Amino acid sequence: MEVKDIFSYDWSYLLPEFIILGFATFLSLLDLFAGKRLGKQVIGWLSFLGTVIAAIFVIINMNALNKPYSYMIDMIRIDDYGNAFKLIFLAGTAFAILISLSYLKAGEVQHRGEYYYLLLTGLLGAMVMASSADLITLFVGLELLSLSSYVLVGLRKKSRLSNESAFKYVVSGSIATAVLLFGMSYVYGLAGTTHIYEISFRLAEAGMAGYQFLVYTAFAFLAVGLAFKISAAPNHMWAPDVYQGAPTPVTVFLAVVSKAAGFALIFRVMMISFFNVSDGTGSGRFFFEEGSLYLGLMAAASMIIGNTMALRQTNVKRMMAYSGIAQAGYLLVPFVPPTSLFFSEVIFYLFGYLLVSFGAFAVIMVVSREQETEDLKGFAGLYHRSPVMAIAMSIFLLSLAGIPITVGFFGKFYLFMGTLVVENYWLAAIMIITSVISYYYYFGIIRQMYMRPGTTEAPMVVPKGIWTFILIMAIATVFFGAFPGLVTDYIQIHFNPSFDFGNMLSPSSQ
C-alpha cells in the first residue's frame, strides 16, 4: 500500500475509534497537568461525553453504510456486525463510568484520573477487535483491552484482595494469550496470510491437501484461548477471584464489555476462518460438524459448571462470576451450529445482559458499601430498608433466571428456539436443566431481601444518581421484556441479521 492510498480512504467510518482515542489522550494530559485543579469528577464526565459522541457517530455510520467498507488491504472492516457490537461496548463503558462517578467518591481507588482513561483505552481495544479483519489488528485490539483490564483490576493498591486478583488475572491472561497466539501461528503457517477472509479459503485448501489434523489443532487452540476472554469453560477459573477483588464497576465492565468483545472475536476468527474447511469426508463443513460440537461441549460445560458452582457461594460477586460463566455458555449456544438468525439471538441476549448486569452490580455496590460486606447476609432485610432497591434487584435476578416478563426470558427463549431449529435437543435440555438449577441461588438472594431480618431497620441512604440509574435499568428490563419486538425489529432493520453464510468473500472482492 502506497502513501497516496491512505488519503484515498473515507476515514469518517473510523470516527468513533478516533474520538475515543482522542478523548483518552486528551484526558491523560488533562489529568497530568490540571487534574488537581479540575477534580476527577470532571474527567469522569468528559469520559462519559466521549462515549456518547462516539456512539452517535456509530449510529450515523449505520445509516450511511450500504455495504462493508475496508481499510488498509482489508485489515479493518466496517460492517453491520462490528457496529452492533460497538454500540454494546459504548453503552457498557458509559454505564461503567456513570456508576463509577458514585463509587469512586469514597476514595477506594487512588488514581481516579487514570481509572477513567484506562476504561476508554479498554473500550478502544474492544472496538478495534470488533472491526478487525486481520489477525494482526485483532491481536493489537485484544492486547489493548487486556492490558487496560489488568491495570483496572489492580487499581485498589491498598487492598490485598485486589492485588491478588490482579496477579491471577495477569498470569491467567498471559497463558491464554500464549495459547491463542500458538493457535494463530498454526493458522498463519497453514494459510500463509493474516487476512481472516483469505484464511477461510486457504484453510479449506490446506484441509483438502491432507493437513486437516493441523487445521483442527489450530481451531482447538484458538477456542481455548478465546474461552478466557468470555470466561467460558475450560478457561473460566480466573473469573470468581477477579470479579471479587476488582472494583465493582470494573467487575461489571469485564462481565459485559470484555465478554461481548470475546464473542465478536469468535465470529471474526472462528466462524469466518474455518467456515469453508471440509469435515474430511467432503460431505460437510468442519465448522458445522466437529467445530460446532467442540463449541457445544464448551457451552454445556460452562452452563453446568457455572450454575452448580454458584450454588456454593456466599459472596455475591463470586456468585455473579459463576453466573457469568453460565451466561457465556448460553451465549455459545447460537454458534452450535449457527443459523441465519444467530446474530439477532446473540445481540438481543447481550443487550438484555447489559441492562441486567449493570443494574444488579449497581445494587450490589450500594449494599456492600453500606453493610461493609459482599456476603449474602448483607442483603438480609433489604426490602424493609429500601423497597425500591429490593424490587429492582428482584427484577434483575428474575431476568437472569429467565422468568417472564423480563428481557432475560426472551433472550433465553430465542436461544432455546434456535437450538430446536437445528435439532440440538441435548443442548436444549442442558439449557433447561441448568436454568432451573440457577433458580436456587437467584431466589436465595431474594429470600434474604424479603424473608430474613437485617442487622438494622434504618432506611438505606442511596445516592440520587445511582438510585436513578438502578431505577432506569429495572424499568428497561421489564419494558423490553414486555415488548421485545422493539429490539428485535430494530436489529433486523439496521443490522442485516440474516447473515449469508455462503458469501464469505473479503470486502475488496465483493
Swiss-Prot record:
GO BP terms, alphabetized: ATP synthesis coupled electron transport
Gene giving rise to this polypeptide: nuoN
In which broad location class does this protein mainly occur, judging by the first location in its UniProt entry?
Answer: membrane
Q: Which domain of life is it from?
A: Bacteria
Q: Which family does it belong to?
A: Belongs to the complex I subunit 2 family.
Enumerate the subcellular locations listed in this protein's record, separating them with semicolons. Cell membrane
Report the protein's function: NDH-1 shuttles electrons from NADH, via FMN and iron-sulfur (Fe-S) centers, to quinones in the respiratory chain. The immediate electron acceptor for the enzyme in this species is believed to be a menaquinone. Couples the redox reaction to proton translocation (for every two electrons transferred, four hydrogen ions are translocated across the cytoplasmic membrane), and thus conserves the redox energy in a proton gradient.
Report the top EC class in one word. translocase
User: What is one cellular component GO term in this UniProt entry?
Assistant: plasma membrane
Oligomeric and partner information: NDH-1 is composed of 14 different subunits. Subunits NuoA, H, J, K, L, M, N constitute the membrane sector of the complex.
Record keywords, A-Z: Cell membrane, Membrane, NAD, Quinone, Translocase, Transmembrane, Transmembrane helix, Transport
Instruction: Give me the reactions it catalyses.
Output: a quinone + NADH + 5 H(+)(in) = a quinol + NAD(+) + 4 H(+)(out)
UniProt-recorded Gene Ontology molecular function terms: NADH dehydrogenase (ubiquinone) activity; NADH:ubiquinone reductase (non-electrogenic) activity; quinone binding
Checking InterPro entries in the record gives:
NADH-Q_OxRdtase_suN/2 (IPR010096), ND/Mrp_TM (IPR001750)
Query: Which EC number(s) are documented for this chain?
Result: 7.1.1.-
**TM ranges:** 14-34, 42-62, 84-104, 113-133, 135-155, 170-190, 208-228, 247-267, 286-306, 323-343, 346-366, 390-410, 426-446, 466-486
State the species of origin. Brevibacillus brevis (strain 47 / JCM 6285 / NBRC 100599)
Give the membrane topology. Answer: Multi-pass membrane protein
Q: What is this protein called?
A: NADH-quinone oxidoreductase subunit N
